[in-house]
Amino acid sequence: MFRIVNGEDYSPAVQQRNIRDFGKAPSLLWTDNGSSNDRCETGGNGRESGQDRVKRPMNAFIVWSRDQRRKVALENPQMRNSEISKRLGYDWKMLTEAEKQPFFEEAQRLRAMHRDKYPGYKYRPRRKAKRPQKSLPADSSVRCSRMHIEETLYPFTYKDGCAKATRSRMESRLSHSQPTNISSSLLPQEHRSSWTSLRHNRVTQAMQTCGRPLLL
């Protein structure tokens, strides 16, 4: 929206009042620096969460490995940090209790200093970030969801259709496997009945093997 500016806005009295009001509200200032914005909005007390986080006191292994890690890194510049950590862990286990004792005492002293400096300190480990799950392609996910919906809404129709299709395929295979030179009309009645029952049994066994419901 636009406001019509009158000539009275530029009078000395109005300008003096604007300057005085502007000086009373310094928190309305905005700068390019993000930390400056926080300080202006919070009255100068804005701090980042990382600065408020208190580190844990060092244990005996950390006290010992500070100088050892630097020494190993200088002697083996091509060694990775993970390999250095494995080597330091192995070397620490190889030390005797007498060799570890000075570092335990130093860690105890640091723990006491930490307790005096932060009396209400409580260790809160950071939560690990969840890894994003691998998503299926769009077309495959749509097909899977569509099949699931169809099977859920029409369970009997879906299963019956599969059973009928499987049965028709089995019957067509059995019909093609018959000898072409023998006609069913020329066979005796008992042979035709035995052949029909045999074909029915084979179809039934095939359907049971496939795990599909059979509709007769």
Curated annotation (Swiss-Prot):
Per its record, how is this protein called by name? Sex-determining region Y protein
Q: Name one Pfam family in it.
A: HMG_box
Q: Where is this region: Disordered?
A: 25-54, 169-188
Upper lineage is: Eukaryota, Metazoa, Chordata, Craniata, Vertebrata
Q: Which PANTHER family match?
A: SEX-DETERMINING REGION Y PROTEIN (PTHR10270:SF161), SOX TRANSCRIPTION FACTOR (PTHR10270)
Q: Give the quaternary structure.
A: Interacts with CALM, EP300, HDAC3, KPNB1, ZNF208 isoform KRAB-O, PARP1, SLC9A3R2 and WT1. The interaction with EP300 modulates its DNA-binding activity. The interaction with KPNB1 is sensitive to dissociation by Ran in the GTP-bound form. Interaction with PARP1 impaired its DNA-binding activity.
The terms under GO molecular function for this entry are: calmodulin binding; DNA-binding transcription activator activity, RNA polymerase II-specific; RNA polymerase II cis-regulatory region sequence-specific DNA binding
The highest taxon in the source lineage is Eukaryota
Show the ranges annotated as biased composition (Polar residues): 175-187
Sorted alphabetically, the Gene Ontology BP terms of this entry are: cell differentiation; male sex determination; sex differentiation
The record's family statement is:
Belongs to the SRY family.
| Matching InterPro entries | HMG_box_dom, HMG_box_dom_sf, SRY, SRY-related_HMG-box_TF-like
Q: What does this protein do?
A: Transcriptional regulator that controls a genetic switch in male development. It is necessary and sufficient for initiating male sex determination by directing the development of supporting cell precursors (pre-Sertoli cells) as Sertoli rather than granulosa cells. Involved in different aspects of gene regulation including promoter activation or repression. Binds to the DNA consensus sequence 5'-[AT]AACAA[AT]-3'. SRY HMG box recognizes DNA by partial intercalation in the minor groove and promotes DNA bending. Also involved in pre-mRNA splicing.
Per its UniProt record, what SMART domains does this chain match?
A: HMG
Keyword presence, Ribosomal protein? no
